[in-house]
């Protein structure tokens, strides 16, 4: 298949626009979508303090020996090495954004993973908005979470900024987004916001997206955990399966010269082999978003995108249930009001 061969070339900047017609009316949460875990960790500030939410032992050691703890945390907390626009070009469409207020950062908001980032929230979201302008048929999911030290005022200002920045590109949480419906409406952005009060105030924001992760450094345990979750049944709507490995503070302090990249690369072949055996869809074991660390060092994105072609081969020829005449008469836009996800 020509489109599949194109995916082998490395970059996937417009992969959604190339998907077969059979997938255009499938809810986005039934497609396989590549995502990056801790998407902003490529720009951690090694001079910033450890987060207040980190274990007390780590914070105490950081106060006493910052020149030792911070480089150590930097090596273990860095899980990506590409800027957001490059991640988009690779094919990433889900962004795990962990937002925080830096102690000495004034009113600006940053991101955090162990320590804080150099790039602000406004700078990062602006980069995504610029990229979307040149890729009008690509749809991204921005998952905002954690909100370390944010005040109510911070939340209000952040939500207002997101809505003003993306405007009509935002998919309403009251809809069931598909590629076709988003294209017809000019929508390109799903924003989940892990604060229920803000979600209730803004229909443009979606509730927090479930993220399955094993909290283990052993890839076999990660796979076993994800398999167990699959057997329990997938959530309705969007959800994430995390291939990311996790180390605790004690291990990090005892291995200051190692890093997450080495650990990830060692496990990647096993994790990607499991990923290649999955299939997207609304069934009990159906995959949706799959997140990984260091998304630029393997064929991760292309592998996940190809799972959608597996879905086409497994499905009946006719996917769209809307009569042809009806679809044409309304200019290809169906009613996708939320009801019973498929």
Functional labels for PLM-detected ranges:
Residues 87, 98, 142, 191, ...:
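Conserved, mostly hydrophobic/aromatic
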Residues 148, 153-158:
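Active-site cleft segment of glycoside hydrolase catalytic domains centered on the general acid/base Glu
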Residues 156-248:
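Active-site-adjacent pocket scaffolds in enzyme catalytic domains
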């Amino acid at each position: 298949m020509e489109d599949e061969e194109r995916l082998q070339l490395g970059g996937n900047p417009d992969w959604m626009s190339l998907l077969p017609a059979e997938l255009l009316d499938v809810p986005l949460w039934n497609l396989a979508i590549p995502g990056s875990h801790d998407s902003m960790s490529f720009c951690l500030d090694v001079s910033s303090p450890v987060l207040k939410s980190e274990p007390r032992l780590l914070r105490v050691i950081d106060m006493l020996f910052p020149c030792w703890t911070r480089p150590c945390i930097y090596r273990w907390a860095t899980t990506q090495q590409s800027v957001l626009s490059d991640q988009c070009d690779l094919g990433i469409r889900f962004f795990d954004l962990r937002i925080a207020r830096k102690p000495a950062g004034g009113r600006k908001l940053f991101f955090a993973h162990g320590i804080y980032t150099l790039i602000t929230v406004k700078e990062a979201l602006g980069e995504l908005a610029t990229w979307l302008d040149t890729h009008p048929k690509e749809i991204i999911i921005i998952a905002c979470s954690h909100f370390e030290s944010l005040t109510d005022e911070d939340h209000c200002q952040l939500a207002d900024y997101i809505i003003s920045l993306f405007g009509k590109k935002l998919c309403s949480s009251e809809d069931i987004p598909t590629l076709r419906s988003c294209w017809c409406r000019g929508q390109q952005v799903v924003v989940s916001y892990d604060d229920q009060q803000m979600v209730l105030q803004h229909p443009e924001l979606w509730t927090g997206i479930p993220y399955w992760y094993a909290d283990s450094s052993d890839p076999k345990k990660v796979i076993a955990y994800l398999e167990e979750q699959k057997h329990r049944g997938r959530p309705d709507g969007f959800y994430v399966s995390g291939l990311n490995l996790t180390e605790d503070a004690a291990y990090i302090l005892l291995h200051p010269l190692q890093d997450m990249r080495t650990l990830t690369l060692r496990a990647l072949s096993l994790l990607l082999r499991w990923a290649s055996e999955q299939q997207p869809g609304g069934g009990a074991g159906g995959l949706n978003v799959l997140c990984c660390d260091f998304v630029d060092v393997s064929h991760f994105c292309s592998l996940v995108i190809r799972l959608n072609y597996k879905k086409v081969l497994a499905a009946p020829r006719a996917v769209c249930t809307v009569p042809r005449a009806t679809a044409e008469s309304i200019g290809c836009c169906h009613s996708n009001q939320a009801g019973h996800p498929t």
